[in-house]
Amino acid sequence: MSSSKRIAKELSDLERDPPTSCSAGPVGDDLYHWQASIMGPADSPYAGGVFFLSIHFPTDYPFKPPKISFTTKIYHPNINANGNICLDILKDQWSPALTLSKVLLSICSLLTDANPDDPLVPEIAHIYKTDRPKYEATAREWTKKYAV
């Protein structure tokens, strides 16, 4: 199956059965460039926010993972100022069996359960580990400022 057929199939699956609190689709007519949105999980400091992500599929998808980055600013130990996401399934744990739907759900759960032991932003990870109320207050502040 070619990458464009696989991407088209994932798009129709997403439209038919969208994952909770996520949506995604192509930007214009470019099947290899998508935009996604994730609703901040209710049980997280990101509640009430809508976060946008940019998705670029490589031409050898699904043998290589999509490149996904946040375009909405977010305060999180695993997401840096450029919107890059530190998530194992987007790197060495990628498998062609994974779908964009599963990846979006993994990003959603990263918002609820950060991984401060594998941080992209060590300063935020340190605050997350040593002063959780301060971390949550700052994350809520950024959510109100950039994602509402």
UniProtKB/Swiss-Prot annotation:
InterPro entries: UBQ-conjugat_E2_core, UBQ-conjugating_AS, UBQ-conjugating_enzyme/RWD. Keywords: ATP-binding, Isopeptide bond, Nucleotide-binding, Phosphoprotein, Stress response, Transferase, Ubl conjugation, Ubl conjugation pathway. The modification Phosphoserine is found at residue 12. CDD domains: UBCc_UBE2D. Pathway: Protein modification; protein ubiquitination. Its EC number is 2.3.2.23. Induction: By heat shock and cadmium. Pfam families: UQ_con. This is Ubiquitin-conjugating enzyme E2 4. The active site is at 86 (glycyl thioester intermediate). Residues 1-22 are annotated as: Disordered. The N-terminus is blocked. Interacts with TUL1. There is a cross-link at residue 91 (Glycyl lysine isopeptide (Lys-Gly) (interchain with G-Cter in ubiquitin)). GO terms for molecular function: ATP binding; proteasome binding; protein-macromolecule adaptor activity; ubiquitin binding; ubiquitin conjugating enzyme activity; ubiquitin-protein transferase activity. It comes from the Eukaryota. It catalyses: S-ubiquitinyl-[E1 ubiquitin-activating enzyme]-L-cysteine + [E2 ubiquitin-conjugating enzyme]-L-cysteine = [E1 ubiquitin-activating enzyme]-L-cysteine + S-ubiquitinyl-[E2 ubiquitin-conjugating enzyme]-L-cysteine. Gene3D superfamilies: Ubiquitin Conjugating Enzyme. Disruption phenotype: Defective activation of the ribosome quality control (RQC) pathway. E2 ubiquitin-conjugating enzyme that catalyzes the covalent attachment of ubiquitin to other proteins. Mediates the selective degradation of short-lived and abnormal proteins. Mediates ubiquitination of PEX5. GO terms for biological process: cellular response to heat; cytoplasm protein quality control by the ubiquitin-proteasome system; mitochondria-associated ubiquitin-dependent protein catabolic process; protein polyubiquitination; rescue of stalled ribosome; ribosome-associated ubiquitin-dependent protein catabolic process; ubiquitin-dependent protein catabolic process; ubiquitin-dependent protein catabolic process via the multivesicular body sorting pathway.
